Amino acid sequence: MNESRHARLHRATSETDITLALTLDGQGRSDVDSGIGFFDHMLTALAKHGGFDLELKAKGDLHIDGHHTVEDVGIVFGQAFRQAIGDKRGIERFGHALVPLDEALCEAVVDISGRPYLAWNVVFPREKIGTMDTELFEEFFRAFAMSAHIALHLTCKSGTNAHHIAESGFKAVARALKVAVSHDPRSAGAIPSTKGVL
């Protein structure tokens, strides 16, 4: 296992330039600037409720739209997560959380399996929150799951307010990840798989 459980990455393309630092065993601190206000709000919540320390500076082609920026942040965040988690020895591997925010209730289930997958069952009642297209939340979580090599199921069980649904979803993922990356004191540092590898 990577004892520091930390990663710092830089990724530059013709569309985005992203620098991200992630510490899994953090204190929920964040310094986030993606250029998209509501997205920053969600990433801050993700760090806080996951217990991660997150630094992010992203510059993207927002004059076009937010798609490239949001998706590429998901890619880099996933890559950093995968690097920080190391060989996965001694982790719980699975995580589950139900998180309410007023009328909204989202459920997240995570398996740090090495088998990337996103099951997305979230419907938003409007197309935008602030300047952010709500369809981009799925793009973010898909990019994250694929790059982190995890299986992630996110389901909205109830909700009528788009802001509440998004925030409930991000917090649910954060809490599920917090459980999944935590140390299992009974595992004696073993890889949590009958195959011996994840």
Swiss-Prot record:
Enzyme type, top EC level: lyase
Location in the cell: Cytoplasm
The EC number(s) this enzyme carries: 4.2.1.19
Entry-linked Gene3D superfamilies: Imidazole glycerol phosphate dehydratase, domain 1 (3.30.230.40)
Catalytic activity: D-erythro-1-(imidazol-4-yl)glycerol 3-phosphate = 3-(imidazol-4-yl)-2-oxopropyl phosphate + H2O
CDD domains, sorted: IGPD
Top-level taxonomic group: Bacteria
Involved pathway(s): Amino-acid biosynthesis; L-histidine biosynthesis; L-histidine from 5-phospho-alpha-D-ribose 1-diphosphate: step 6/9
One BP annotation, GO: L-histidine biosynthetic process
Keyword Hydrolase: no
Annotated family: Belongs to the imidazoleglycerol-phosphate dehydratase family.
UniProt name for this protein: Imidazoleglycerol-phosphate dehydratase
Name of the gene encoding the protein in the UniProt record: hisB
